[in-house]
């Protein structure tokens, strides 16, 4: 690492954005680099996020890596890779999400729920997972970031009774499985939004009930070369 990069540890400047390193534990000397990568991705995705929101995203990443061993949150331990594959990957869906209350099923470490809550403070977000330790982490990081719009709940989806306008998930390999467990919790005129790698096959889509209409959105995730798609499903009368 160059001396100039080391010297910039005291502040990460992204145009007019200043990231104070106070409170960061794991990102350390990489904070300026990570801040610049994040700022560039936000610009490429057409998002408008304040300096505080950008700081919150980086603090979330810092906490994710700090508590990873204790809570078994992610297999990715490199900060740059985690920023791209977790934070920026989730940022890519923000502009495509319908409005309204949101439930994230199988949220794990809070992805995409925490990212959405940071970016859209006006939206009520619920993070649902049966893993108590991961929900404990989300409660902790939500408190530290002041996310009053975030409600972490430790429960299986089958035992959860509320309904939501938007239901998201990164956790399901099968689109059919996601629809099956999410549909009972979907509000009238609501939307299911599944984050996927490859676009679903014709066989997968044909297996859905004829009651559903769908839209496949190809996502361009900055610095990520893997395929990413958002599958939006709604009832045909929506």
Curated annotation (Swiss-Prot):
It is found in: Cytoplasm. InterPro entries: rRNA_ssu_MeTfrase_G, SAM-dependent_MTases_sf. GO terms for molecular function: rRNA (guanine-N7-)-methyltransferase activity. GO terms for cellular component: cytosol. The keyword Methyltransferase applies. Its main location: cytoplasm. It comes from the Bacteria. Pfam families: GidB (PF02527). S-adenosyl-L-methionine binds at residues 106, 111, 157-158, 170. The keyword Zinc does not apply. Its EC number is 2.1.1.170. Belongs to the methyltransferase superfamily. RNA methyltransferase RsmG family. This is Ribosomal RNA small subunit methyltransferase G. It comes from Psychrobacter cryohalolentis (strain ATCC BAA-1226 / DSM 17306 / VKM B-2378 / K5).
């Amino acid at each position: 690492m160059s001396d100039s990069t080391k010297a910039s540890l005291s502040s990460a400047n992204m145009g007019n954005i200043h990231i104070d390193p106070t409170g960061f534990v794991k990102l350390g000397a990489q904070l300026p680099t990570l801040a610049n990568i994040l700022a560039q991705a936000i610009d490429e995705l057409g998002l408008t996020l304040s300096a505080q929101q950008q700081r919150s995203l980086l603090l979330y990443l810092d906490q994710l890596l700090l508590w990873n061993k204790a809570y078994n949150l992610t297999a990715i331990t490199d900060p740059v890779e985690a920023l791209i594959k977790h934070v920026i990957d989730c940022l890519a869906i923000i502009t495509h999400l319908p409005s309204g209350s949101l439930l994230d099923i199988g949220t794990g470490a809070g992805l995409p729920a925490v990212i959405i809550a940071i970016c859209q403070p006006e939206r009520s977000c619920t993070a649902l997972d049966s893993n108590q330790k991961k929900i404990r982490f989300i409660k902790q990081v939500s408190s530290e970031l002041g996310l009053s719009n975030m409600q972490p709940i430790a429960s299986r989806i089958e035992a959860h009774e509320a309904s939501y306008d938007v239901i998201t998930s990164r956790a399901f390999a099968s689109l059919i499985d996601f629809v099956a467990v999410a549909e009972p919790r979907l509000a009238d005129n609501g939307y299911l939004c599944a984050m996927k790698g490859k676009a679903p096959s014709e066989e997968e889509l044909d297996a859905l009930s004829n009651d559903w209409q769908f839209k496949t959105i190809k996502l361009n995730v900055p610095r990520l070369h893997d395929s990413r798609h958002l599958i939006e499903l709604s009832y045909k009368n929506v």
